């Protein structure tokens, strides 16, 4: 038994169906089937864990609020205390192409609500949920906040985001870097041929908009693939490719093409068929006089055939030594890519 049978004889999904949700950039349902029994649970659980923990994203790491020394402070004219403001800042969704850290600033006077859309971004930073409310200002109140944004993966607690040389007033924030917000999956039975107990894996995915759900699954699968490579302790035997030996022909391979493959009128094609002319090799050996003696074959059909043959560099009345070959049907199949 060859080692390849361990994986080559397992059934693999013949399709991956992606159904976008109401917001195609954030929601989607993916269905993979058929899978070997048990593989739906295995793949679904592994992909879900990687999707939630291991994809790269961007998030706020810390914030500095003018006039605030620590997160247990309050700000005159701001209805929320700093603790609530920090909790709201955690929910800001960000897309950033380059490497961090980078800065964002928001500055606003009351009365009114400060939203994520008020943040002044620079470079390649995009705020994905601009309607998110950060705080509410009374008349005459003013606030200025400076955010530090960075890239990472998974969840990082606020204490880990505090630099050793953090200045007074720098407030670290819990960072949820993962662009994937929710993942659920279910496994059902599906049918393949006469077998009814294969697995059907359905995954429902929600992202923050920094990545599409199907791209997120693709990256997660690539991460798993890369991590599993270390467990493969062998090289696959190379398949021996035997090159087919094409025999030399004593005539043009185009003669092996059937005349019904030519673009002829129905009348001309029927006349050739009734005269038992099957291959071009049969046709080119005929003279014009012989063709005109064919029942229902007239000058118009003759001119049509002469024109088609001329386009191939052929003509009527040719001599074809060795025609027809004994194994003509076999040769026609072997040379079908050569004419």
Curated annotation (Swiss-Prot):
Classification via Gene3D superfamilies: 5' to 3' exonuclease, C-terminal subdomain, DNA-directed RNA polymerase, insert domain, RNA polymerase, RBP11-like subunit
Region (Alpha C-terminal domain (alpha-CTD)): 251-339
Biological process per Gene Ontology, one example term: DNA-templated transcription
Reaction catalyzed: RNA(n) + a ribonucleoside 5'-triphosphate = RNA(n+1) + diphosphate
Keywords (A to Z) from UniProt: DNA-directed RNA polymerase, Nucleotidyltransferase, Transcription, Transferase
EC code: 2.7.7.6
One of the record's GO molecular function terms: DNA-directed RNA polymerase activity
GO cellular component: cytoplasm; DNA-directed RNA polymerase complex
Chain segments carrying region Alpha N-terminal domain (alpha-NTD): 1-235
Subunit: Homodimer. The RNAP catalytic core consists of 2 alpha, 1 beta, 1 beta' and 1 omega subunit. When a sigma factor is associated with the core the holoenzyme is formed, which can initiate transcription.
Known function: DNA-dependent RNA polymerase catalyzes the transcription of DNA into RNA using the four ribonucleoside triphosphates as substrates.
Protein family (similarity comment): Belongs to the RNA polymerase alpha chain family.
Written domain comment of the UniProt record: The N-terminal domain is essential for RNAP assembly and basal transcription, whereas the C-terminal domain is involved in interaction with transcriptional regulators and with upstream promoter elements.
Protein name: DNA-directed RNA polymerase subunit alpha
Originating species: Rhodopseudomonas palustris (strain BisA53)
Gene designation: rpoA
């Amino acid at each position: 038994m060859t080692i390849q049978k361990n994986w080559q004889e397992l059934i693999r999904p013949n399709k991956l169906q992606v159904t976008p949700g109401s917001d195609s950039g954030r929601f989607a349902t993916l269905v993979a089937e058929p899978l070997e029994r048990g593989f739906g649970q295995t793949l679904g659980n592994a992909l879900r864990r990687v999707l939630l923990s291991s994809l790269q994203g961007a998030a706020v790491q810390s914030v500095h609020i003018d006039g605030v020394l620590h997160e247990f402070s309050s700000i005159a004219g701001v209805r929320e205390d700093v603790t609530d403001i920090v909790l709201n800042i955690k929910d800001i969704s960000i897309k950033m192409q380059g490497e961090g850290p980078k800065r964002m600033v928001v500055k606003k006077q009351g009365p009114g609500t400060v939203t994520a859309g008020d943040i002044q971004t620079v470079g390649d930073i995009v705020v994905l949920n601009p309607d998110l409310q950060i705080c509410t200002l009374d008349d005459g109140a003013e606030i200025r906040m400076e955010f530090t944004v960075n890239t990472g993966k998974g969840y990082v607690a606020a204490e880990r985001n505090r630099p050793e040389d953090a200045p007074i007033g720098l407030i670290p924030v819990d960072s949820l870097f993962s662009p994937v917000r929710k993942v659920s999956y279910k496994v059902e039975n599906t049918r393949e041929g006469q077998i009814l107990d294969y697995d059907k894996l359905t995954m429902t995915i929600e992202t923050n908009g920094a990545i599409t759900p199907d791209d997120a699954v693709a990256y997660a699968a690539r991460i798993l693939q890369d991590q599993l490579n270390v467990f493969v302790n062998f090289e696959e035997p190379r398949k021996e490719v035997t090159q087919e030996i094409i025999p030399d022909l004593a005539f043009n391979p185009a003669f092996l093409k059937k005349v019904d493959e030519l673009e002829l009128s129905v009348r001309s094609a029927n006349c050739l068929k009734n005269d038992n002319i099957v291959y071009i090799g049969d046709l080119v050996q005929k003279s014009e006089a012989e063709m005109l003696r064919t029942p229902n074959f007239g000058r118009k059909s003759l001119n049509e055939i002469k024109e088609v043959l001329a386009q191939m560099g052929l003509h009527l009345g040719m001599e074809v030594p060795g025609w027809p070959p004994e194994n003509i049907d076999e040769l026609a199949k072997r040379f079908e890519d050569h004419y």
